[in-house]
A protein has these predicted regions:
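Active-site-adjacent structural elements in enzyme catalytic cores
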Residues: 1-171
């Protein structure tokens, strides 16, 4: 869609990332519009993101390109494409060059607890694989499929943020 827009516009175009640093990345037009509704006039709707994960960021400004942020495209895929063994994340550079390297980036507003076997009363559970039916929650993937879980991750984190706000869980 973006390529078609650029071709039909017949003028140069520049656009920053729509992601606000420190906030969740959006993978659906609805979530994006809700986040930006007071600061944009329109939204080009191409549907939900196919992959759901952040992009892989590669630093090619250095002598030996390296991965700054892991995403859906793997180190092996990039190395095969370039016919060069690209350095893994943080091996060559310690200086932060990409927002995805920050300790807190694309974070939900809701309080998250990782690796919980059983949620506390009133918590909302996000599971990888089935969870007990008596527990309020969402399942990234019933079949433990990594691609399905990746596609659903950010959308479900947005849902959990909304549910947490509705329950009064975010100050």
């Amino acid at each position: 869609i973006a390529s078609r827009l650029i071709r039909e516009l017949e003028k140069p175009i520049a656009a920053p990332s729509a992601n606000k640093s420190g906030k969740l990345s959006c993978t659906s037009p609805g979530d994006e519009f809700a986040k930006l509704k007071n600061s944009i006039d329109a939204l080009l709707n191409g549907g939900d993101a196919e992959l759901g994960l952040e992009s892989t960021v590669v630093d090619c400004s250095v002598e030996k390109p390296c991965i700054l942020r892991l995403g859906n495209i793997t180190r092996e895929e990039i190395s095969n494409c370039l016919d060069y063994d690209i350095a893994p994340i943080s091996q060559l550079e310690k200086k932060i060059k990409s927002p995805g390297q920050l300790l807190k980036h694309y974070s939900p507003d809701a309080k998250l607890l990782l690796n919980q076997n059983k949620p506390n009363r009133g918590d909302i559970f996000l599971s990888f694989g089935p969870h007990p039916k008596e527990i309020d929650g969402l399942t990234l993937t019933e079949s433990k499929n990594l691609e399905e879980a990746a596609k659903n991750l950010f959308t479900f984190l947005h849902i959990l943020d909304r549910l947490s706000k509705a329950k009064g869980g975010i100050p």
